[in-house]
Amino acid sequence: MTQHDTTLDETQIRIDLAAALRLSCREGWHEAVANHFSAAVSADGKKFLVNPRWVHWSRVKASDLVLCDADDAATMDRPDAPDPSAWAIHSALHRKLSQARVALHIHPPHATALAGLVDPTIKPIDQTTARFYNRMAYDMAFGGIATAEEEGERIADAIGDAKTVMMQNHGVTTLGETVAEAWDALYHLERAARTMVLAYSTGRELAVMGDNMAEDVAMEWEADRAQQLSHFNEMKRILDKEEPDYKD
């Protein structure tokens, strides 16, 4: 497979995905050399980039990202094969979900703590938690470490048409049209989870918004797409100054 097999700006997508990995590492969301981010580089979404197998996110560069085809059954036989879980999950997402142009799967501390509860629901108790009101899928049927393609298929089915999923006993995944959209959602999802964990830690009753207010706040978030792009671009400017090799 070569760059000529794709129809989108693969160079820019590589830079953005490498930036998302570096930024997530700086935030402390990564887990050793596991977890995985991917981004489609073809119009049908099936050709996608994913971070290289077991390379620490603080070191990943744009040129390191591995180009895969979701329909290529021989992918795991390649010398540069991605992590088995990355292939199982992301090949299914890019093959089955039209909204999965970008898929960020990770186990950040607060969201993963919330995923370990019997009820991992993010409740609308402030404006950030309300962003996700009625807009998340909840995968409540953890099937073990996702090294089998069947588990990836199950996860894709559980997500349905959502763009954000809380995966009980596992972690979270955000989807988007762009890396900026998916990363901004991930940032605010972890913030929302942190708010939930801190609120629960008080042992006091939560002040949950009414349905109408929560929906209004969520809609306001959806109307402010420009802020998502600005957020990601500002974070990339920090990398441009402090870790410019992410673009290499």
What residues fall within each predicted segment?
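Glycine-rich flexible loops
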Residues: 1-248
